[in-house]
Amino acid sequence: MIKGLLLDFYGTVVEDDDTIMQAIADQVAADAATSVSRGHVMDAWTREYEAVAAGPQFRTLRHCAMRSLATVMAEVGCAGDPATLCAAQFRYWQSPPMRPGTREFLSQVTVPICVVSDVDRADLDTAMAHHGLAFAAVVTSEDVRAYKPDRAMFARALAALDLGADEVLHVGDSMSADVYGAHASGIPAVWINHRGQALPSGTPVAAEITDLTGLIELIA
């Protein structure tokens, strides 16, 4: 019996920042000294971000975003201030649009929810206030000083709800951070596949849904 839920936030409860990141990548590609595509900038930015986030010293998400973008800008010869370019992304984190189905789901769910999000606490608090959202518990990467898939994130969430791994589902859109992160902690994972991707063979998912309304029957 499911007694609680762990929910990713960006890409699960609210829309992810893909569009904003693509716009930033477009600007970097347009201003680069060499001919590069948006896709090249996006791939490089993602790679550098993951390297910074996985480093030995914890960095806030805002720092990770700016530091990794600065590295990519230097690589392609793009002059400018990464903080200025990232400003739109930071604003987005504080007022993202709600994902389809979220309001309907939240109006029907009865089990306690802990949000588990790779984001700075102030940005998440502002985003939740923007939409008038409240949950039983909230765990951010800044609170734990670690990012998913680190087990510490999931352990903190379970402790916050006072539930065991076999009593909850973790729900998120990231295969690496959410699905494999939860699986490594012994928590069944539900994948939010809002991009219409093919589920890789052997992926440890308890269920695949497109939005949170798909959870209603799963936890009934």
Where on the chain are the PLM-derived regions?
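Asp-based, Mg2+/Mn2+-dependent phosphohydrolase catalytic module
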Residues: 1-5, 80, 103, 107, ...
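N-terminal helical cap/lid subdomain that shapes the substrate entry/recognition surface
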Residues: 2-103, 120-122
